[in-house]
C-alpha cells in the first residue's frame, strides 16, 4: 500500500467521498525532476498533455514545453496560462481557421508540426498571408496514418525554399507506447539519426531539433516487471549520446510522467453471490477506470482496500471477489477474483497509477452516470477540488 496522505481529508471533507480522482502533485513533480536529472543535458522534456490535461498547469513548474494536439487542448493551455513559446502545436488534423486564430493571436510564436503535405501548405499559406515565418517540425511516419512518408520529407526538404512562411527546424517521431525494453527505441533512434544525416548530405539541411516519443513502459499490474527508472533512463541516455546528431533532443512523454501520481477512489455499494460467484458492486467502473493492457479484467492492478475511516483492511483471510462497476452492462467488470479482506458496504477501494488517460478515456456518457470529482493533493496545501462532479444526463438529452 502507498501512503495515501489525502484519504483522511477526503473522507472528512465529503459526506460521500467517492467516486473521485486524486492527483498527488508533489509526487508528480518529484518524479518529473528525477527523470530530467537522469537524462541530464542529453534531452529536454515535453509533456504530452493528452495523457492528463488537468496536470497542464502544475506541469508548468517542471517541464519546458507542452505537446498540444487539438483546439480544445489549446484552449486549456490558454486558460491555465501556458505561454505560446512553450507550446508544440501538434495533431493529425489542423484546419485553416484554427491556424489563422493561433497565428494572428500569438504572432507566430511556438512550434508547429507538419503531419502531411496539406498541413505544410496550410501553415505556410497562413503564415505568408499574415506576414510572418513560423517554426515547424516534420513528423516522420512510423507506418500508420500519422506523419509524413520519408520520400515526401526528402522532397519537402529539397524544395524548402518554396515555403517562405515556415522554418523547418527538424523532425518529430513517435511510434507507440508501453515499450518494455530499449531495443525498439534503439532501432528507431539509429534510423532517425541516419535519416537526418541523409537529409544533410542530399539537400544541405541541418536539423536543429529531434523531438522523439520514447514510449517508456509503465507497470500497471502486479505481475508486470518493474524496472528501476534510473537504470532505464541511464541506458537510454547512452543511446542519445551515441547519436551522430548533436542538435537538441526533446522527449515527448505523457503516460510515463503522469501515471504514478494518480489515484481513483471508489466505494463498495453492494455485494452478492450469484451461482457461487461473489460480486462487489462499486460506485464507479469502466466508465472511470481504464488501464492500458487490461485483458478481460484478468490482470490485477495495484489497489488497496480501506475501511470507512481510511484505514487499510488487513485482518482475516483473503477472499476473491469480482469487482464490478455501476453500469448496466456485463462489460463493467474492473477486476476478476481480486483479493479482499472481509469486504463490507462502504469500504473504500483506492486504485493506483491512474494519473494518465483514465481521467479522459472512460466511456463517461454511457448510462448518464455523473463524472467523478477531481482533486489535487500536496503535503503543504492538502486537498483542492479542481472539478466538481458533473451530471452527464444534461449532455445526453435534447433539453
Provide a role label for each language-model segment.
Residues 43-209, 235:
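Active-site-proximal beta-alpha core segment in soluble small-molecule metabolic enzymes
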Amino acid at each position: 500500500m502507498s501512503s495515501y496522505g489525502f484519504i483522511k481529508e477526503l473522507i472528512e471533507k465529503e459526506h460521500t467521498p467517492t467516486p473521485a480522482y486524486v492527483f498527488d502533485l508533489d509526487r508528480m513533480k518529484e518524479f518529473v525532476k528525477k527523470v530530467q536529472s537522469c537524462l541530464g543535458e542529453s534531452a529536454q522534456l515535453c509533456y504530452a498533455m493528452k495523457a492528463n490535461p488537468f496536470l497542464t498547469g502544475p506541469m508548468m513548474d517542471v517541464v519546458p514545453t507542452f505537446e498540444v494536439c487539438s483546439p480544445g487542448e489549446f484552449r486549456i493551455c490558454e486558460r491555465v496560462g501556458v505561454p505560446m513559446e512553450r507550446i508544440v502545436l501538434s495533431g493529425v488534423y489542423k484546419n485553416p481557421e484554427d491556424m489563422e486564430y493561433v497565428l494572428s493571436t500569438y504572432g507566430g510564436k511556438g512550434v508547429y508540426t507538419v503531419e502531411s503535405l496539406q498541413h505544410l501548405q496550410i501553415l505556410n499559406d497562413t503564415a505568408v498571408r499574415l506576414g510572418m515565418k513560423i517554426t515547424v517540425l516534420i513528423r516522420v511516419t512510423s507506418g500508420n496514418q500519422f506523419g509524413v512518408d520519408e520520400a515526401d520529407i526528402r522532397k519537402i526538404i529539397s524544395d524548402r525554399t518554396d515555403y517562405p512562411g515556415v522554418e523547418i527546424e527538424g523532425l518529430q517521431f513517435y511510434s507507440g507506447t508501453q515499450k518494455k525494453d530499449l531495443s525498439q527505441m534503439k532501432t528507431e533512434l539509429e534510423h532517425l539519426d541516419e535519416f537526418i544525416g541523409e537529409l544533410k548530405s542530399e539537400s544541405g539541411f541541418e536539423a536543429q531539433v529531434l523531438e522523439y516519443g520514447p514510449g517508456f513502459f509503465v507497470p500497471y499490474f502486479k505481475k508486470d516487471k518493474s524496472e528501476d527508472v534510473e537504470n532505464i533512463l541511464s541506458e537510454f541516455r547512452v543511446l542519445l549520446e551515441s547519436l551522430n546528431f548533436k542538435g537538441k533532443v526533446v522527449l515527448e512523454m505523457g503516460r510515463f510522467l503522469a501515471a504514478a501520481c494518480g489515484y481513483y477512489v471508489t466505494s463498495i455499494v453492494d455485494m452478492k453471490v450469484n451461482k457461487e460467484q461473489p460480486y462487489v458492486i462499486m460506485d464507479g467502473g469502466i466508465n472511470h477506470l481504464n488501464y492500458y493492457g487490461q485483458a478481460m479484467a484478468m490482470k490485477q492492478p495495484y489497489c488497496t482496500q480501506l475501511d470507512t475511516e481510511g484505514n487499510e483492511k488487513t485482518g482475516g483471510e483473503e477472499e476473491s471477489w469480482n469487482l464490478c462497476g455501476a453500469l448496466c452492462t456485463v462489460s463493467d467488470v474492473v477486476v476478476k477474483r481480486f483479493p479482499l479482506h472481509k469486504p463490507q458496504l462502504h469500504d473504500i477501494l483506492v486504485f493506483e497509477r491512474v494519473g494518465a488517460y483514465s481521467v479522459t478515456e472512460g466511456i463517461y456518457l454511457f448510462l448518464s452516470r455523473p463524472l467523478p470529482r477531481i482533486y489535487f493533493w500536496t503535503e503543504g496545501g492538502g486537498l483542492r477540488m479542481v472539478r466538481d462532479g458533473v451530471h452527464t444526463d444534461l449532455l445526453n438529452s435534447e433539453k
